[in-house]
């Protein structure tokens, strides 16, 4: 069970205690529905309300990771159940950091991963309410690869007018591509 703080204070979601019957790290919210639709692609969102909102608008392959901390057990569940995982976490700092952590887990499990980058809203719920499911699906179809996402995040964190940052950027990109570093 979970409740959501309506004033967007931190933490947004407050979960009931875990016990031998329920452990949120082993489950994905709405996973049973997504599986029923036999989708080869699952859109993983951060919050329960994101998943509920997407389902209400006909996007039945959305699941929520029950917070920002994707676990290895959740990753294995996804790996066994679909061909592609599209991460659509919130655009805030916590959501972006969680995206990076989740990417690492899913990459290590051998998942085909894409990252949803919506514009004009803070999360999938707000976006689909504001712009509709067709436009949301347009962004899903344009979800970017893991390498592309990491390169974009790296660009944001460095000053590419600075020579040292430029070298750091190139070395990191080369590392991501599995090549040798530049001197």
Over which residues does each language-model region extend?
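C-terminal or mid-to-C-terminal helical accessory/interaction module adjacent to the motor/catalytic core
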Residues: 112-183
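Phosphate-handling DNA/RNA-contact segment within nucleic-acid enzymes
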Residues: 4-85, 98-99
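Conserved acidic, small-residue-rich alpha-beta core segments centered on
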Residues: 86, 98-109
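Acidic, metal-coordinating catalytic cores used for nucleic-acid/nucleotide bond scission
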Residues: 49, 70, 89-99, 117, ...
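Short, hinge-like loop/turn segments at secondary-structure boundaries
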Residues: 81-82, 103-105, 131-137
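Flexible glycine/proline-rich, aromatic-decorated loop/lid segments
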Residues: 75-78, 104-106, 145
């Amino acid at each position: 069970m979970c409740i959501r703080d309506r004033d967007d204070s931190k933490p947004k979601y407050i979960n009931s205690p875990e016990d031998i019957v329920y452990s949120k790290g082993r489950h994905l919210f709405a996973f049973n529905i997504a599986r029923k639709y036999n989708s080869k692609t699952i859109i993983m969102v951060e919050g329960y309300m994101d998943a509920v909102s997407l389902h209400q608008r006909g996007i039945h392959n959305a699941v929520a990771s029950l917070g920002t901390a994707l676990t290895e057990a959740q990753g294995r569940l996804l790996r066994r159940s679909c061909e592609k995982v599209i991460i659509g976490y919130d655009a805030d700092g916590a959501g972006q950091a969680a995206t990076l952590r989740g990417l690492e887990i899913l990459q290590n499990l051998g998942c085909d991963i894409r990252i949803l980058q919506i514009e004009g809203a803070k999360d999938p719920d707000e976006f689909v309410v504001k712009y509709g499911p067709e436009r949301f699906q347009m962004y899903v179809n344009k979800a970017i690869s893991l390498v592309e996402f990491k390169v974009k995040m790296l660009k944001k964190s460095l000053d590419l007018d600075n020579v040292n940052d430029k070298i750091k950027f190139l070395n990191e990109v080369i590392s991501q591509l599995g090549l040798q570093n530049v001197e």
